[in-house]
């Protein structure tokens, strides 16, 4: 994806730009810059004539506008400044980015940062603008998609009329790195599963290690069997594609400092196994590696930002397929932790691969905290829809930090409870636990299952089943929750 050159310059000359982006409030009111550039009369006239009512998300491009030395003037509606919400502001940013992408703009002055929702500051506005405009250039390109002439964005640079303070520069750098990380996450998740296999994910990690200097270690099937990863290997045994345990290490702090661990579910295609899923929309089960794609997207951002902390990634990756040798309902397997699991439903496979990954992460890296992420339960979509991801954990301060970063980036999490009362649903007559707990509280019982493997570490679980991709005519991966996780990690420094 092409990278925009973002700049901070408090003293701007309109003659230096071919496009000016201007926020407009209802009643045609605009910013101080508009008044100084004698544009207030123009926006007021357009409002009075009913040509531009400045509703949130409304845009209008004017060419060769009078009184200013720009080829284009992009008006962006913001509604009532007293009631402008974060949601409304971001809708306006996305609309502006789309309008700009459909124009010939090359060198842009962006004044949308002069219009900020209540309880936010200029650095926040710069972050959100940078994220929105950089993300708008994303276009899925792969050999599986026969596009003769891929669109080449014209936009080269965007300047904010703001001081180049440390806080503002951090906002630009963090947002752009997050957007580029999201693009990698989207590329991996959007890729057909016959291309994006566990081997492909491992090769991607190896390429990233070469680019950014990460340490990389790929565990193969024979090695994992010898180690005793009976739960992970049980899921993998029905697939022809070999499973991988993909491990990346980023060291930005002293080696003695315990790392933060990110663990991502990497089921590159989930049929449900013997407990076969319905055929409708099964193509979307290529997105069941959204947790793995998110972890790699976060590491893409880390490689660009080079923060002063240590982070490790562990990605268990496999397909979940029906076969003559696939696991069956009623089978009992022994996990790496030594705990046994009765498999009542082979479509609850994510927790089976994650539990061994969580144990391996603790044994190998001794992390200060673990955050795992997975497209784990359909119950999460029923509970929270597609607006927020679920977060559960055994350390409230860790959960609070994730929620705070989600709120700051508007890549939000909603905390759901963990309680020993839910353990009753995981009881088995034939093993230490069952891998499902029935229909009730499905997201919670899935996390309650994982909690049995994280008792000795500060741990949080993110269920991103409702946020990792969208269906319908705009089907595709979202890149979430890369922005929130990047912010969370930077806040740990």
Swiss-Prot record:
- Could you say which cofactors this protein requires? Mn(2+)
Pfam families in the record, alphabetically?
Answer: Peptidase_M17, Peptidase_M17_N
Gene source species = Hydrogenovibrio crunogenus (strain DSM 25203 / XCL-2)
How does the cofactor bind to this protein, according to its record? Binds 2 manganese ions per subunit.
Residue positions binding Mn(2+) 1? 270, 347, 349
Which sites bind Mn(2+) 2? 265, 270, 288, 349
Q: Which Gene3D superfamilies match?
A: Leucine Aminopeptidase, subunit E, domain 1, Zn peptidases
Named from the GO MF annotations, one term is: manganese ion binding
Residues annotated as catalytic: 277, 351
**Compartment(s) of residence:** Cytoplasm
Q: Which family does it belong to?
A: Belongs to the peptidase M17 family.
* Entry superkingdom: Bacteria
Provide the function of this protein.
Answer: Presumably involved in the processing and regular turnover of intracellular proteins. Catalyzes the removal of unsubstituted N-terminal amino acids from various peptides.
Q: Which EC class, in a word?
A: hydrolase
Which EC number(s) does the record attach to this protein?
3.4.11.1, 3.4.11.10
Could you give a single Gene Ontology term from the biological process aspect?
proteolysis
Query: Which terms in the GO cellular component ontology are assigned?
Result: cytoplasm
Keywords, ordered alphabetically: Aminopeptidase, Cytoplasm, Hydrolase, Manganese, Metal-binding, Protease
This enzyme catalyses:
Release of an N-terminal amino acid, Xaa-|-Yaa-, in which Xaa is preferably Leu, but may be other amino acids including Pro although not Arg or Lys, and Yaa may be Pro. Amino acid amides and methyl esters are also readily hydrolyzed, but rates on arylamides are exceedingly low; Release of an N-terminal amino acid, preferentially leucine, but not glutamic or aspartic acids
Q: What is this protein called?
A: Probable cytosol aminopeptidase
Q: Which cysteines are joined by disulfide bonds?
A: none
């Amino acid at each position: 994806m092409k990278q925009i050159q973002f700049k901070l310059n408090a003293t701007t000359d309109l003659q230096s730009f071919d496009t000016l982006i201007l926020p407009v409030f209802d009643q045609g009111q605009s910013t101080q810059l508009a008044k100084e550039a004698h544009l207030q009369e123009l926006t007021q006239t357009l409002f009075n004539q009913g040509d531009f009512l400045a509703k949130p998300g409304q845009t209008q491009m004017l060419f060769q506008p009078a009184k200013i030395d720009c080829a284009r003037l992009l008006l962006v509606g913001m509604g009532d400044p007293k009631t402008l919400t974060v949601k409304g502001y971001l809708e306006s940013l996305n609309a502006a980015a789309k309008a700009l992408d459909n124009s010939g703009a090359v060198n842009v002055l962006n004044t949308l940062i002069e219009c900020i929702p209540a309880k936010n500051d200029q650095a926040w506005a710069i972050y959100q603008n940078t994220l929105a405009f950089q993300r708008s250039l994303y276009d899925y390109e792969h050999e599986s998609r026969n596009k003769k002439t891929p669109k080449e964005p014209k936009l080269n640079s965007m300047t904010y009329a703001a001081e180049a303070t440390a806080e503002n520069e951090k906002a630009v750098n963090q947002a752009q790195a997050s957007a580029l990380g999201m693009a990698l996450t989207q590329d991996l998740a959007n890729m057909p599963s016959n291309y994006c296999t566990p081997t492909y994910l491992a090769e991607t990690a190896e390429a990233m290690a070469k680019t950014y200097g990460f340490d990389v270690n790929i565990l193969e099937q024979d090695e994992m069997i010898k180690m005793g990863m009976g739960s992970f290997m049980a899921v993998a045994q029905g697939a022809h594609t070999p499973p991988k345990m993909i491990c990346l290490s980023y060291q930005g702090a002293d080696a003695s400092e315990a790392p933060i661990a990110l663990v991502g579910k990497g089921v590159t295609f989930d049929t449900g196994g013997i407990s076969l899923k319905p055929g409708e929309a099964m193509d979307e089960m290529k997105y069941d590696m959204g947790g793995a794609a998110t972890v790699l997207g976060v590491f893409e951002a880390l490689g660009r930002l080079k923060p002063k902390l240590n982070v490790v990634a562990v990605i268990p990756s496999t397909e979940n397929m029906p076969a003559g040798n696939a696991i069956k309902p009623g089978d009992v397997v022994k996990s790496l932790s030594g705990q046994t699991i009765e498999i009542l439903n082979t479509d609850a496979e994510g927790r089976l691969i994650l539990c061994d990954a969580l144990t391996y992460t603790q044994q190998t890296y001794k992390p200060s905290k673990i955050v795992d992420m997975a497209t784990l339960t359909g119950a999460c979509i029923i509970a929270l829809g597609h607006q927020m991801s679920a977060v559960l954990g055994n350390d409230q301060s860790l959960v609070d930090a994730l929620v705070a970063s989600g709120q700051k980036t508007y890549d939000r999490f909603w905390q759901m409870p963990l309680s020993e009362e839910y353990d009753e649903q995981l009881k088995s007559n034939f093993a230490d636990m069952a891998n499902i707990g029935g229909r009730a509280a499905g997201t919670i019982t899935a996390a309650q299952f994982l909690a049995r493997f994280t008792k000795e570490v500060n741990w949080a679980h993110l269920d991103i089943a409702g946020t990792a991709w969208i269906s319908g005519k705009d089907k595709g991966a979202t890149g979430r929750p890369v922005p929130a996780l990047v912010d969370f990690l930077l806040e740990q420094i």
